[in-house]
Regions:
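Basic nucleic-acid-binding interfaces
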Residues: 1-153
Length: 153
């Protein structure tokens, strides 16, 4: 039997795994553009590191992203605001033509978000995320692979 080893914080212990989804404003299908999708993925990785949010799975469809994240000590609104704000600002700075063409100077993400607390059905939700049009497995492993590739190990 696997030993439960919850995440430890300065004043709390535990995990808060959420199936999370953000949709682009006006449901524009910007993630069909490979460069935009890959840049957004890298921005999410940066945000996860910056805010110490663990991500097990992430998958993009044409106009939205799904992810399995542990919120740690953050509330749902805090996590959504941080992740959406970080990725939107940097992505629209990098691609000003997308901002002008699709979002008319407004933000990247729809103000709404979806977060569902995942317990026993984590495997089902991970499977669902992996069935997205563009999905990636195990963000931690991706970081390791990037490190190995960069260092030539």
């Amino acid at each position: 039997m696997k030993k439960y080893d919850p995440t430890r914080y300065s004043s709390a212990v535990g995990e808060a795994w959420m199936h999370t989804s953000f949709k682009t404003k006006f449901t524009h299908e910007i993630f069909d553009i490979k460069e935009v999708r890959e840049y957004c993925l890298n921005l999410f990785k940066e945000a996860f590191n910056r805010y110490k949010i663990e991500c097990r799975k992430i998958g993009f469809d044409s106009n939205h992203v799904h992810m399995m994240i542990d919120l740690g000590n953050y509330s749902r609104p805090q996590a959504a605001k941080m992740l959406k704000g970080y990725t939107a600002k940097k992505l629209l700075q990098k691609f000003p033509l997308i901002k002008k063409k699709y979002f008319w100077g407004s933000g990247l993400w729809s103000p709404a978000y979806y977060m569902y607390s995942v317990g026993k059905d984590m495997q089902f939700m991970e499977s669902y995320i992996m069935k997205q049009k563009y999905s990636l497995d195990n963000i931690v492993q991706l970081k390791l692979n990037s490190f190995v590739h960069a260092t030539g190990l």
